[in-house]
Every structure is written in C-alpha cells, then in structure tokens.
Regions:
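Low-complexity, intrinsically disordered Gly/Pro/Thr-rich segments
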Residues: 209-223
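Exposed beta-sheet edge/beta-hairpin loop segments within beta-rich domains
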Residues: 150-152, 220-225
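Aromatic- and glycine-enriched pocket-lining scaffold segments that form the walls
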Residues: 228
Length: 239
C-alpha cells in the first residue's frame, strides 16, 4: 500500500530536557496525535547527538535520489527505501518548520560498503553512491530515495544524518544516526542482495552507540510496495 506522509505519525512521548551550551539542538520522533503531518507541528523529543563516524565526506552533492554513483551512473542494488525527514525549531511549545536547512544523509550499501573511502578495509575513493543532501522545503521536509542499509561487523543497521542551519548570525550543526527495528531488518536481510552474505552479527542492543539513546532514533517505517517508507522528525531549539 502506498504511504502518504501527510498523515498522523505514531511514536513515543518523552520529557523535554535542556542541553548545556548557547545553542540547544534536539531530535525526536513524531508523536501520536491528531495533527496531520504538514499541519500543526508535533512536540520535539530530546535525543542525544551521535558521532558522524569515520566515513562522512562533505561531497556537497545535492540530490534526492542517492542510489547512483555519479562517476558512472550505476545504481546500488537493494530494497527500496523512501526516507522523509522534517526539520523543525522549538518555539512557544511548538515545532515550527525550518526552511533552507542542509540535510546530509549517508550510509553503507547492501554489502556494508561506504563510498568515497580509502582505508584498510575499503577502497572506494572517487565514488559517491548513497550520499547526498537536500534543502528543507517550506514544511521543513526533505525526501530521499535510497535503499535499505546493509550490515557490517560491530554496528547495528543505521543511516547517518547531519543538519546544518544558518539562522541569523548563528550557524548550527547537529549530527546523529537513524536506526531500524531489528525485526524489520531481519525480514529485509532475508531478501537479495542482502541474503547469502555473512550473517548480521550486531543487533541494536549489541551496539554501544545504539544503547546511547538509539531507541529514540528508530524510524517509523511501513511497507511501500516492494520496499519501505520511513519517517523521522528532527527539532532544533535556540537557548
């Protein structure tokens, strides 16, 4: 069934907490409420930053469909994933859309490989598959077409994201990661091109990064044809 993101989302409510520093940045899942997505904004749920990891590359590659490698046009194979994120600013107890924010996403392919990396384990320098950024629209939304991430030793299945804004004379940056329910990943990774590869060794609860706030970073995902549609809210708050 095709998913329409202009619907109520389901999620969990958490208590708001303040972060130290001149700028407070928060990220959170959408809450169960009657407001339609794109209408009244949900309350923000505070979750921790997470590391950008060793494989962030500031490609400055603006595109919605990140499946291809710009160097040769080839698509990375995998189960389709439509990812929608909404960026909002907490103001007066409401999350108002943030327009013009740069939202980068990057993740590994079905084999657990990142693009544009040259280290002891990966030799993909010069490629840029599964990387890109979008600017938030009038509703604070960005949409990406990608594939469901693969797995590699030591990490739960995840997508990295970075939000950069320039509000007045103050630039802010928030970096974190998105996760998936283990049961969903189990189903997806039974399908090609994931199936037949080394078994997924690290589940969410076995990943130290996930244990540091990852439960509130799990996307809301639903089946969408042959693939999945996933949604997540991120909020920014000024002190």
């Amino acid at each position: 069934m095709k998913m329409n993101f202009v619907e109520p989302w389901r999620g969990r409510r958490a208590a708001m907490r303040k972060l130290a520093g001149s700028v407070v940045l928060v990220a959170g899942r959408a809450l169960a409420q009657r407001d339609a997505f794109g209408g009244a904004a949900p309350a923000c749920v505070l979750t921790p930053r997470q590391t950008e990891g060793p494989y962030f590359v500031d490609e400055r590659l603006q595109r919605a469909d990140i499946r291809s490698d710009p160097s040769n046009g080839t698509l990375r194979s995998g189960v389709p994933l439509a990812l929608v994120m909404r960026i909002a600013a907490l103001s007066g107890g409401r999350c108002e859309p943030v327009t013009g924010a740069i939202v980068d996403v990057w993740h590994c392919d079905a084999a657990g490989v990142y693009s544009d990396v040259d280290d002891a384990s990966l030799r993909t320098k010069g490629t840029a598959f599964l990387r890109g950024y979008q600017l938030t629209d009038a509703h604070g939304q960005v949409r990406f077409t990608t594939i469901y991430p693969g797995a590699y030793r030591g990490r739960a299945v995840h997508i990295h994201f970075k939000v950069r804004t320039n509000r007045g004379d103050r630039a802010t940056e928030f970096t974190s990661q998105l996760y998936f329910d283990d049961r969903l990943t189990d189903r997806v990774h039974e399908r090609p091109p994931y199936a037949g590869r080394a078994s997924r060794r690290t589940r969410n609860g076995d990943d130290a990064l996930f244990r540091a706030g990852g439960r509130s970073l799990i996307v809301d995902a639903r089946q969408d044809g042959e693939g999945y549609a996933a949604a997540y809210d991120v909020g920014l708050r000024g002190a």
